[in-house]
């Protein structure tokens, strides 16, 4: 952080590479690393799928099989309907979010400095620390909730659910509609902000630890064990947040698909 104050250093690391100003702008770094994470996921799983063998599997095949069976077991326990779409969706969500989260383990200065060699002055590499990315994913989940609700109950069932629940009387239709709308909207919003909040906080802590290296020798020496300890703990955080996003998606879709009347 030579030539920068602490506040300038932190502000620089929290600035996006973007086009445009104001609300209507595109975070190029978020898009790039989101797509990169998806490509890594597709490459690894397609490669393992092509080389899958009934004999003694390799380490990567074992890992992929464990993850697939684990996710399929979770979907089987929580989603009581056809799993041909939900199970692959859950697997994709978990692996994709995990890979995006794992980018946070790369030292905070490495990627921005590398990008600086190509004249790129701002770069945030963790897509899930960008609220626009997490909101985008949660909005997709929101539309899937509506789709599975209509698929299982029909459009009339959807209208009935949002007008006659929890109070089954025509006089309470406005109250029911407000309550159910708030409940429905709270699902994608909570999904987005939970993932964003945890990853943003994790990224900020890494940046604050990096600031310690520019202080005196005693504080800089303290930063090394702190960095290592937080990185180890953060492995749990990135895995847990990927699991929570996947799990809540499956649960929300299961509730939407439930054919039983309330």
From Swiss-Prot:
Bilayer topology annotation: Multi-pass membrane protein
Function, in words: Key component of the proton channel; it plays a direct role in the translocation of protons across the membrane.
Coiled-coil ranges from the UniProt annotation: none
Gene Ontology MF term list: proton-transporting ATP synthase activity, rotational mechanism
Highest taxon of the lineage: Bacteria
Annotated protein name in UniProt: ATP synthase subunit a
Subcellular location: Cell inner membrane
Main localization, broad class: membrane
Similarity comment: family membership: Belongs to the ATPase A chain family.
PANTHER family: ATP SYNTHASE SUBUNIT A, CHLOROPLASTIC
Quaternary data: F-type ATPases have 2 components, CF(1) - the catalytic core - and CF(0) - the membrane proton channel. CF(1) has five subunits: alpha(3), beta(3), gamma(1), delta(1), epsilon(1). CF(0) has three main subunits: a(1), b(2) and c(9-12). The alpha and beta chains form an alternating ring which encloses part of the gamma chain. CF(1) is attached to CF(0) by a central stalk formed by the gamma and epsilon chains, while a peripheral stalk is formed by the delta and b chains.
Pfam families per record: ATP-synt_A
Segments passing through the bilayer: 26-46, 86-106, 130-150, 204-226, 240-260
Originating gene: atpB
Swiss-Prot/TrEMBL keywords: ATP synthesis, Cell inner membrane, Cell membrane, CF(0), Hydrogen ion transport, Ion transport, Membrane, Transmembrane, Transmembrane helix, Transport
GO BP of this protein: proton motive force-driven plasma membrane ATP synthesis
Listed GO CC annotations: plasma membrane; proton-transporting ATP synthase complex
InterPro entries per the UniProt record, alphabetical: ATP_syn_F0_a_bact/chloroplast, ATP_synth_F0_asu, ATP_synth_F0_asu_AS, F0_ATP_A_sf
């Amino acid at each position: 952080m030579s030539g920068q104050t602490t506040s300038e250093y932190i502000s620089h690391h929290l600035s996006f590479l973007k086009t445009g100003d104001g609300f209507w702008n595109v975070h190029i770094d978020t898009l790039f690393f989101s797509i990169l994470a998806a490509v890594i996921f597709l490459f690894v799983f397609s490669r393992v799928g092509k080389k899958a063998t009934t004999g003694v599997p390799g380490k990567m095949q074992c890992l992929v099989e464990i993850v697939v069976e684990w996710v399929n077991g979770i979907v089987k326990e929580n989603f009581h309907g056809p799993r041909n779409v939900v199970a692959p969706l859950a697997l994709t969500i978990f692996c994709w979010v995990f890979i995006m989260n794992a980018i946070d383990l790369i030292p905070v200065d490495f990627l921005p400095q590398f990008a600086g060699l190509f004249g790129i002055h701002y770069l945030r590499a963790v897509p899930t620390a960008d609220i626009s990315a997490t909101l985008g994913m949660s909005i997709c989940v929101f539309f899937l909730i509506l789709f599975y609700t209509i698929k299982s109950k029909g459009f009339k069932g959807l209208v009935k659910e949002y007008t006659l629940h929890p109070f089954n009387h025509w006089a309470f239709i406005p109250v029911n509609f407000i309550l159910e709308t708030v409940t429905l909207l709270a699902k994608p919003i909570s999904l987005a902000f939970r993932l964003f909040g945890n990853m943003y906080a994790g990224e900020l802590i890494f940046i604050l630890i990096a600031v310690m290296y520019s202080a005196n020798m005693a504080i800089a020496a303290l930063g090394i064990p702190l960095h290592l300890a937080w990185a180890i703990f953060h492995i749990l955080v990135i895995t847990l947040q990927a699991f929570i996003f996947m799990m809540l998606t499956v649960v929300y879709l299961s509730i939407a698909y439930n054919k039983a009347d309330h």
